[in-house]
C-alpha cells in the first residue's frame, strides 16, 4: 500500500481487484493512470486501470486494477531482470512530460518544492546535503522513473515475468534514482556512467526529502545516513 494512499483487495464475481484511493491532485493522478495505461499497451507488466462504467479511469480519486499474484524478488537473477526492465522503462519514456505538480531532482537544485518534496520545511544544512547528492547524478537521459522500486513494489510471476506495482511516487527524472535500491550483489547496467555510491547517495537524499513532511522520523534517519555517506 504505502503511506500516501489507501489500498484494499476486492472481489467481484470471483475475480480479485486492487482498489486504490489516491491522495494525489486530480491532474497528478490522471498522469499516473494514463502512464500505466500506455505502459500496459506497450507490453510492460503494470497495474492497468479498469475503467468505470462511464469510461473514467478514476472516480473521486479511487481507481481499480486487476489483482496480480506474485512474489517479491530475492535471487540475483530475478533482480537482474528487474534492472533490465527498469532500463527498458527509461529508454521507452525519454521525453515524457513531467507529472503535474512534481519536480525533478534537477528542478529542485533551484526550486524548493514539487511532488512530496518541500525543501522549505527542511533545515538549511539538510537542503544543502540533498542538493549536493542530486547534483552528482545529473547526467544521462531524463525519463519516467518509478521512484520506489523496492522489493515490496515488484512482483515476480510464476512465468518469470516482472511486474512493477504502486506507481504513486512516479515522476520524470534521471533514471539513476530507480537503481538506488538494487542489491549490492546485482550488477548495474554496463553503460552506467556513475558510481554506485553516487546513485545510492542520491536515492537516500531523495527519501529524506520526500519523507520529511509525511514521515519525519524516517526522514531524519535517512538524513543522518546521508550525512554519514557524505562525510
Name each region found by the language model:
Residues 184, 188-231:
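Helix-rich C-terminal or lid/interface subdomains of diverse kinases
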Residues 1-12:
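ATP-binding glycine-rich phosphate-binding loop
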Residues 136-143:
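Protein kinase catalytic-loop region centered on the HRD/HxD motif
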Residues 61-76, 110-117, 205-220:
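A glycine-centered beta->alpha junction motif in the catalytic cores
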Residues 144-146, 151:
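Catalytic-loop of the protein kinase fold
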Amino acid at each position: 500500500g504505502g503511506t500516501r494512499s489507501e489500498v484494499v483487495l476486492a472481489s467481484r464475481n470471483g475475480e480479485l481487484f486492487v482498489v486504490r484511493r489516491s491522495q494525489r491532485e486530480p491532474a497528478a493522478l490522471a498522469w499516473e493512470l494514463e502512464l500505466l495505461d500506455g505502459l500496459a499497451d506497450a507490453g510492460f507488466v503494470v497495474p492497468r486501470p479498469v475503467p468505470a462504467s462511464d469510461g473514467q479511469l478514476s472516480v473521486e480519486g479511487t481507481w481499480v486494477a486487476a489483482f496480480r499474484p506474485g512474489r517479491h524478488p530475492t535471487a540475483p537473477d530475478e533482480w537482474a531482470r528487474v534492472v533490465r526492465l527498469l532500463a527498458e522503462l527509461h529508454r521507452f519514456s525519454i521525453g515524457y512530460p513531467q507529472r503535474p505538480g512534481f519536480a525533478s531532482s534537477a528542478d529542485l537544485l533551484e526550486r524548493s518544492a514539487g511532488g512530496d518534496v518541500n525543501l522549505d520545511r527542511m533545515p538549511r544544512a539538510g537542503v544543502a546535503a540533498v542538493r549536493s547528492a542530486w547534483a552528482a547524478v545529473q547526467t544521462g537521459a531524463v525519463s519516467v522513473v518509478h521512484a520506489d522500486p523496492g522489493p515490496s513494489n515488484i512482483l515476480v510471476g510464476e512465468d518469470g515475468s516482472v511486474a512493477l506495482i504502486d506507481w504513486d511516487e512516479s515522476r520524470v527524472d534521471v533514471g539513476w534514482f530507480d537503481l538506488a535500491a538494487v542489491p549490492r550483489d546485482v550488477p548495474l547496467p554496463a553503460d552506467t556512467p556513475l558510481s554506485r555510491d553516487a546513485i545510492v547517495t542520491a536515492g537516500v537524499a531523495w527519501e529524506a526529502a520526500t519523507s520529511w513532511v509525511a514521515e519525519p522520523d524516517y526522514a531524519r534517519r535517512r538524513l543522518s545516513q546521508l550525512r554519514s555517506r557524505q562525510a
